[in-house]
């Protein structure tokens, strides 16, 4: 493990005191945080969590910390991390939390603790400009559309000024502009130290800043992507750290499943062909025969890729994901074998070119990797993986995802560190960490569970309407729309309506039509950041959204006074990954619904409902329109997990609650019915 280089003055006073004692002093009523931070208020839960985190920094091990909203968990782990003197890796599930830590919390703590430390904010490689690839694209003679030329000029102007190469600095570059994929610093295109632009490489600079930093902030996508690349022995950017803190840890299983799998897509084949044509157009070789042969093979590979991915489309069932097996892939064998053969010829021809450049060697490596991955996918016989076809717009992906990532998370992410803290507002089910322990491979761990600091009996009411049909009913969407119309009349808009699927959202949107007297914002009509900005600024707005708005959203005050959830968020048993995980549980004699689907749905539901009460002054209505929470036996598990807000089945109680001044919120609402 790489040796840490802590800032020398991190611990200059009271060396005889333990870290736990110094952290306790920082959080004391008369401590430095209380004296310097205007919004600081002593919270018992925050102190307890900070002490538990400090114990990990002193003694090692793993800590599972569930800290309800309002606990102040971010400061509870940042203060011990800063004071520990170790290099600490902090990974978050959302960009919002990354931004909060780097731009708000760390500067405030630097002043409050009077401690000098350095921090680096790291993003995934795809966020950074590759100077070498950009130079090739800019100087090539490829035909470009006017809009592509305009975007390239925007990047060109910015590239001469930026110190970081982070595309987030370019306000005029849309998130989904295709040209960025050609010039970003993704690992499969990286030439490493052989790159002519290596000394000026933005990714190399970022990694050097991280090596020299005490606190390194990443997100789960970079954490897992980097660990997966590290296994293949090239391209990692995160330096070794003694300790890690994984916030929003409930998201880690899904992200790890994505990055520790294998995927081959029509995009990757198209990009390989495009990059090869561009390189050949530069006349970088004195071997014209091999160059002509390579042109032929590239064209052949493109044609065979079109045939192969076109044949895959025949397997696509209803929905975006379709499970495949060695049997269902059999009709594609010939097309896949021809594509594999072309990739093999591609690689061999590149290797035979005399005086080939580093760029050509990188292309050969990419072709070999695609060849190996296609062979693995074609066999589709590894019992540890689930194989499926995924369609995303024009993208066609053949994937193999690990069914169980617990050993991967344990061995590749957690055991690399002397100590790790996994924290979230939602880690326990039925009062136990057993579910998350099993999913993330956490065998031995310390545990701490801290309730929310908010007074839900005063700040919220839970509305469960009695007359809703079952979600499978043809009347469900129209009933949701009717219920929304009546509920939003009481709340005067100011609501998130969160749906478990786009199909449900679209059906309710169509039912609502123009009947709502409030501004209606719909996911998909504009970028996520635009919708959030409009919701915060347009009075009485209503937002209809799906999964991406269930987590990581913070709208304070009366702007958001109601969160409506249409259905209990069960993962679809038709989803290939869900189905495979349920089969594994069933094969060992377990109950996949009780052991997997219900716990996962409970954590997801709590995240969705958690959008409402974010601060002590927030008040509002939590509305769940799924009758199964009342009528099914498993509904009791959901009810027991919900915040302790009063429950009502009547809109008149909701109106009374909203009309009641703060601190009298539960006076005229029913007692809790749990």
PLM features: what roles do these ranges have?
Residues 13-65:
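Conserved pre-motif I regulatory segment
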Residues 83, 99, 107, 187-189, ...:
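Signature of the SF2 helicase/ATPase Hel1-core->accessory helical subdomain module
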Residues 88-96, 421-423, 493-500, 623-625:
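Conserved RecA-like ASCE P-loop NTPase motor core of nucleic-acid helicases/translocases
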Residues 2-36, 86-214, 221, 276-292, ...:
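A substrate-engagement module of RecA-like helicase motors
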Residues 453, 461, 465-475, 520, ...:
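Conserved RecA-like P-loop NTPase helicase motor core
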Residues 181-216, 227-235, 339-468, 475-482, ...:
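A contiguous, basic/glycine-rich beta-loop/short-helix subdomain that forms a polymer-engagement track
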Residues 54-55, 74-87, 104-108:
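Walker A/P-loop NTP-binding motif
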Residues 500-524:
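Conserved helicase motor "Helicase C" RecA-like lobe of SF1/SF2 P-loop NTPases
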């Amino acid at each position: 493990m790489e040796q840490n280089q802590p800032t020398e003055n991190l611990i200059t006073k009271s060396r005889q005191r333990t870290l736990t004692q110094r952290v306790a002093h920082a959080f004391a009523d008369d401590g430095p945080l209380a004296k310097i931070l205007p919004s600081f208020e002593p919270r018992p839960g925050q102190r307890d969590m900070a002490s538990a985190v400090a114990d990990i920094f002193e003694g090692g091990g793993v800590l599972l910390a569930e800290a309800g909203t309002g606990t102040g968990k971010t400061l509870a782990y940042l203060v011990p991390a800063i004071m520990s003197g170790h290099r600490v890796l902090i990974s978050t599930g959302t960009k919002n939390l990354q931004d909060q830590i780097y731009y708000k919390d760390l500067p405030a703590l630097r002043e409050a603790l009077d401690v000098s430390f350095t921090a680096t904010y790291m993003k995934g490689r795809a966020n950074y400009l590759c100077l070498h690839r950009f130079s090739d694209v800019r100087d090539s003679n490829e035909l470009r559309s006017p809009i592509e030329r305009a975007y390239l000029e925007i990047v060109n102007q910015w590239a001469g000024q930026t110190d970081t190469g982070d595309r987030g600095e370019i306000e005029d570059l849309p998130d989904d502009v295709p040209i960025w994929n050609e010039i970003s610093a993704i690992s499969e295109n990286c030439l490493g130290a052989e790159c002519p632009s290596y000394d000026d490489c933005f990714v190399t600079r970022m990694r050097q800043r991280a090596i020299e930093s005490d606190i390194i902030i990443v997100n789960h996508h970079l954490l897992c992507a980097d660990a997966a690349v590290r296994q293949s022995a090239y391209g990692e950017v995160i330096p070794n750290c003694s300790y890690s803190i994984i916030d929003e840890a409930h998201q880690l299983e899904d992200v790890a499943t994505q990055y520790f799998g294998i995927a081959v897509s029509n995009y990757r084949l198209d990009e390989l062909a495009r990059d090869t044509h561009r390189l050949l157009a530069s006349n970088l070789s004195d071997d014209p025969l091999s160059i002509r042969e390579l042109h032929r093979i590239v064209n052949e590979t493109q044609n065979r890729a079109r045939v192969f991915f076109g044949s895959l489309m025949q397997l696509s069932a209803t929905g975006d994901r379709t499970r495949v097996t060695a049997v269902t892939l059999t009709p594609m064998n010939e097309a896949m074998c021809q594509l594999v053969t072309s990739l093999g010829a591609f690689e061999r021809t590149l290797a035979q070119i005399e005086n080939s450049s580093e760029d050509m060697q990188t292309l050969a490596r990419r072709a070999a990797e695609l060849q190996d991955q296609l062979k693995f996918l074609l066999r589709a016989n590894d019992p540890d993986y689930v194989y499926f076809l995924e369609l995303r717009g024009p993208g066609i992906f053949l994937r193999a995802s690990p069914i169980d990532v617990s050993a991967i998370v344990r061995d590749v992410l957690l055991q690399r560190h002397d100590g790790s803290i996994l924290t979230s507002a939602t880690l326990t089910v039925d009062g136990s960490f057993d579910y998350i322990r099993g999913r993330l491979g956490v065998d031995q761990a310390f545990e701490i569970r801290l309730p929310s600091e908010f007074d839900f009996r005063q700040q919220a009411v839970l509305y469960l309407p009695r007359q809703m049909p079952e979600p499978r009913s043809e009347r469900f969407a129209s009933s949701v729309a009717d219920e929304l119309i009546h509920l939003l009349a009481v709340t005067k808009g100011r609501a998130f309506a969160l749906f478990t699927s786009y199909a449900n959202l679209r059906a309710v949107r169509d039912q609502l039509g123009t009947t709502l007297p409030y501004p209606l914002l719909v996911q998909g009509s504009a970028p996520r950041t635009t919708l959030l900005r409009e919701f915060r600024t347009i009075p009485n707005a209503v937002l209809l959204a799906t999964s991406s708005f269930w987590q990581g959203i913070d709208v304070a005050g009366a702007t958001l006074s109601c969160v409506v959830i249409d259905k209990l968020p069960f993962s679809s048993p038709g989803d290939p990954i869900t189905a495979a995980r349920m089969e594994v549980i069933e094969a060992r004699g377990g109950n996949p619904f009780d052991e997997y689907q219900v716990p996962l749905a409970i954590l997801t539901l709590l995240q969705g409902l958690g959008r409402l009460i974010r601060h002590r002054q927030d008040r509002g209505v939590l509305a769940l329109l799924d009758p199964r929470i009342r009528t099914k036996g498993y509904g009791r598990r959901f009810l027991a997990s919900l915040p302790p807000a009063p429950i009502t089945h009547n809109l008149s109680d909701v109106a009374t609650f909203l009309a009641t001044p703060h601190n009298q919120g539960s006076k005229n609402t029913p007692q809790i019915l749990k």
